[in-house]
Amino acid sequence: MLVAGSECNSVAEEAATCEGVTKVLYVDSKEYENFLAENIANLIKNVSDDYSSILAPATTNGKNYMPRVAALLDVAQISDISSVESEDTFQRPIYAGNCIATVQSSDSKKVITVRTTAFDAVAKGSNSAEILKLEEVNDAGISEFIKEEL
């Protein structure tokens, strides 16, 4: 699991307690504070060598940086999956959810956004995964966070 942000040590510690998590990669830097897509995409690409699948929630942020990750890795993105059939086959809704498509990828690395409501939440338990702090800093200098308003 990758945790990136600013002053997010407590998030990394909580992630380490999730069932099934064996290692948490943790990066704490102001460059990741506002989740600028260019910075996060470069970070994910740079730490992806040891992984065959890269998953993110199909949220506004995930839908912003995951296409960039796929492009940097020169693979297709598999969007909004609702089911995993096998290591290379997934189901996803199409036509506004009126049909379900089965998608198979032959890419060696899978870049996937996940429809989180389609899966059960991960249980937190007595698990204590290794937390590995990285010094990976990527400021692409392409975009700048100005402000957030409601």
PLM features: residue spans?
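N-terminal glycine-rich FAD/FM-binding segment characteristic of electron-transfer flavoproteins
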Residues: M1-L150
